[in-house]
């Protein structure tokens, strides 16, 4: 069984990352310890709580974000600082425009990157510690929250034969959920395992790129960017959907992707209503550790419109926000997730465990923001969340 002993005796760095010129917050910046696989990310307001073992207090604390210089400071210099605000500088590297000597176009860059996936991503078994969250919203009101601490085991990044069958094996450490998971509105959401669906959104792991030549010829190369001391190719596609891919120069590793589609698509009919897919937004980010790129975080937002079957009028909207943050990576792992510990393929709300407050108090989650406080306000109409976690 998985040990939770490592959750005890941790030290915490809390703060906010901002642009050093504009003072604007830096959302989804990667927080970490140099040379270690432990990490978290900032929220929409650039805020973070980072729980780390005390033996890391003499190591270097780091913040990385696309287009910015890497921020580094000894951990011990940040401990105990009230209202810690860290100003991160934009990259001062002079980046050439698209017309540069290497002459590669967007399609060629991505084709090389895809061909090098097995060089740049793990090809030996590995384990990841992760934090999963899904939030459901109906007609503008948040109705449910589920969070889980998970272990994820995978063999490698070899291209799967079936790109729609989960290759990773997931073990649940802790699960907590709000009362809203028993709401009548939950039937308007997919009742399957939503974490399994989220992992299948990893376009690099599951090679979701079209094979047709027209896809590659439609890609446009944008101005280069900068990340963690390296120049980055930026490739985009703007057609019926938007796609943006960041590829590290030299290794051709895909380090970050953004995808958005707003095309309406018929889905299903239920209780005198018909549903149409309205929006999908996906962000995938990778982090380098010991020469290989591992999943850092994945966010997926989706929206479905529900119409009256007879009048065709919009009745309400359902929205689902899913996030998976990887807290720590264990390369070349000899550990496995036993069949008895494996997550089942039905909804996580039916696999919840007794609430463990001490565990969650010391676990790296995505820090709540003002937006999250609106979520909490909606959910607590049925009682304090802490009480809901205990009773569900």
Q: Where are the predicted features?
A:
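Short, acidic Ser/Thr/Gly-rich low-complexity loop/linker segments typical of extracellular
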Residues: 37-47
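A short, solvent-exposed loop/turn motif at the edges and junctions
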Residues: 62-73
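Extended beta-strand-rich segments in extracellular/periplasmic secretory proteins, especially
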Residues: 206-259
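Hydrophobic beta-strand segments
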Residues: 29-33, 46, 61, 100
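Short strand-edge motifs at loop-to-beta-strand transitions and within beta-strands
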Residues: 48-50, 82-84
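Short Pro-Gly-centered beta-turn/loop motif in secreted/extracellular proteins
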Residues: 23, 50-58
């Amino acid at each position: 069984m998985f040990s939770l002993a490592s959750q005890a005796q941790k030290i915490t760095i809390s703060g906010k990352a901002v642009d050093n010129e504009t003072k604007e917050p830096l959302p989804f910046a990667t927080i970490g310890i140099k040379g270690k696989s432990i990490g978290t990310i900032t929220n929409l307001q650039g805020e973070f709580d980072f729980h780390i073992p005390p033996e890391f207090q003499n190591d270097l604390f780091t913040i990385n974000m696309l287009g910015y210089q890497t921020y580094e400071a000894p951990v011990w210099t940040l401990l105990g600082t009230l209202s810690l605000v860290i100003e991160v500088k934009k990259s001062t590297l002079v980046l050439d425009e698209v017309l540069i000597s290497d002459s590669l176009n967007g399609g060629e860059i991505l084709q090389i990157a895809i061909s090098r996936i097995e060089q740049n991503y793990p090809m030996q078994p590995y384990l990841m510690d992760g934090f999963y969250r899904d939030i459901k919203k109906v007609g503008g009101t948040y109705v449910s929250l589920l969070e889980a601490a998970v272990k994820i085991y995978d063999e490698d990044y070899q291209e799967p034969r079936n790109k729609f069958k989960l290759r990773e094996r997931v073990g649940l450490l802790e699960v907590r959920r709000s009362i809203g998971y028993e709401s009548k509105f939950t039937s308007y959401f997919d009742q399957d395992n939503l974490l399994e669906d989220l992992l299948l959104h990893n376009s690099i792991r599951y090679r979701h790129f079209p094979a047709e030549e027209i896809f590659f010829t439609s890609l446009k190369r944008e101005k280069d960017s900068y990340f963690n001391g390296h120049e980055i190719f930026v490739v985009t596609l703007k057609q019926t959907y938007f796609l943006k891919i960041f590829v590290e120069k030299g290794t051709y590793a895909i380090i970050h992707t953004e995808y958005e589609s707003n095309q309406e698509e018929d889905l299903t009919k239920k209780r005198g209503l018909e549903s149409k897919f309205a929006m999908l937004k996906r962000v995938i980010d990778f982090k380098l550790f010991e020469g290989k790129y591992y999943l850092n975080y994945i966010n997926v937002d989706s929206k479905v419109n529900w119409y009256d079957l007879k009048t065709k009028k919009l009745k309400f909207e359902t929205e689902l926000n899913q996030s998976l943050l990887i807290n720590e990576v264990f390369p070349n792992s000899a550990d496995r997730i036993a069949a008895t510990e494996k997550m089942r393929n039905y909804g996580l709300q039916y696999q919840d465990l007794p609430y463990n407050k001490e565990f969650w108090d010391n676990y790296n989650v995505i820090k709540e923001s003002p937006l999250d406080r609106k979520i909490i306000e909606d959910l607590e109409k049925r009682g304090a969340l802490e009480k809901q976690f205990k009773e569900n």
